[in-house]
Amino acid sequence: MGCTSERACKVRVVRRKLVVFVPVSALESVCEALFAAGAGHIGGYERCAWYTPGMGTFLAGEGAAPTIGEVGQERRIGEYRLETVYPTELEADVVRALLESHPYEEPVFDLYELLEPEV
């Protein structure tokens, strides 16, 4: 399905989505830090997020300093997949808040552009 007009085909990036995997015990503190940095606003709503439980696995290698477990031992731990949005201009603040509040030595996170039509 193609665009019917040039105007309908124009999009802009004004927000991004952060997806991060957080241990169950750290969900609230990470959310609080992200919200304080400006994440979680959608229209007239604040503190917007979505999370679902899952199981994370990892094996800390030599030279790692794992928060949970020991080097050389594979671990499985209950985690949440946490998603929230933020304005692009706050990306540095949001990522800094994530890294400072997340308990893992190497937090796993993704940043996605959210395209919005120009109207």
What are the functions of these language-model segments?
Residues M1-V119:
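Hydrophobic structural segments
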